[in-house]
From Swiss-Prot:
It comes from Saccharomyces cerevisiae (strain ATCC 204508 / S288c). The lineage of its organism: Eukaryota, Fungi, Dikarya, Ascomycota, Saccharomycotina. One of its GO terms (biological process) is negative regulation of transcription by RNA polymerase II. InterPro entries: Transcription_factor_GATA (IPR039355), Znf_GATA (IPR000679), Znf_NHR/GATA (IPR013088). CDD domains: ZnF_GATA. GO terms for cellular component: nucleus. This is Nitrogen regulatory protein DAL80.
Length: 269
């Protein structure tokens, strides 16, 4: 026997009569298997027989009628939400002892402003007081960058008015209970002219390198100029040779013209 799909009877009186006793003598639907009149949902099998929800589900799952021994007078409701809440509470209890979880939970409460820590409590750490007081995100001391001595000396060799001392602001922090005092001290000032003109100890090692670089540069320039001069002298010699050849040719042509002119002026008789 195979059960058809779940069926809610079309008559509203049937569903209303599910939890009402037969006190007025009217006919109420009755399960043909366990003869109960209380059920949250009425079903039918493939032959149209009226069954309660429990008998209908049992028949659909197992393919056989539900035994009478399984009949109960109380209707049990599912408690999924309660189980889920219990699971959540169980998980919360199991992870409540984790120090990382506790720290994150405290940090979340502090950042959202949902909680405050008593400053008089000796168990409260300085970090928690620091996070509660003043600003939630404290200022961190900037990382100091140490200038490279080689680069600094090279720059000083090229630009004699460029100091190598690092500039910046020094942030001082004092933690007293829950108060934070921050003070900015300007350490950088314009150097005096005498300070700029004084030789730097870092530049002594770079002086030979700079002098060698300038010497090499000057030698390259001298070689380039000598090459250019030799090229110009060669071109000048070529032009001189060509001019000399042209002068010789002009002289020969003049001699020929004079000879022809003399021959024409004295014809033979």
């Amino acid at each position: 026997m195979v059960l058809s799909d779940s069926l809610k009877l079309p008559s509203p009186t049937l569903s209303a009569a599910a939890g009402v006793d037969d006190c007025d003598g009217e006919d109420h639907p009755t399960c043909q298997n366990c003869f109960t009149v209380k059920t949250p949902l009425w079903r039918r099998d493939e032959h149209g027989t009226v069954l309660c929800n429990a008998c209908g589900l049992f028949l659909k799952l197992h393919g056989e009628p539900r035994p009478i021994s399984l009949k109960t007078d109380t209707i049990k409701s599912r408690n999924r939400k309660k189980l889920n809440n219990n699971n959540v509470n169980t998980n919360a209890n199991t992870h409540s002892n984790d120090p990382n979880k506790i720290f994150k939970r405290k940090k979340r409460l502090l950042t959202t402003g949902g909680g405050s820590l008593p400053t008089n409590n000796p168990k409260v750490s300085i970090l928690e007081k620091f996070m509660v007081s003043g600003s939630i995100k404290p200022l961190l001391k900037p990382k100091e960058t140490v200038p490279n001595t080689k680069e600094c000396s090279t720059q000083r060799g090229k630009f004699s008015l460029d100091p190598c001392e690092p500039s910046g602001k020094n942030y001082l922090y004092q933690i007293n209970g829950s108060d934070i005092y921050t003070s900015n001290i300007e350490l950088t000032r314009l150097p005096n002219l005498s300070t700029l003109l004084e030789p730097s100890p870092f530049s002594d090692s770079a002086v030979p390198e700079i002098e060698l670089t300038w010497k090499l540069h000057n030698e390259e320039e001298v070689i380039k100029l000598k090459t250019k001069i030799s090229e110009l002298e060669l071109v000048t010699d070529l032009y001189k040779k060509h001019i000399f050849q042209l002068n010789e040719k002009c002289k020969q042509l003049e001699v020929e013209l004079h000879s022809r002119a003399s021959v024409q002026s004295h014809p033979q008789h």
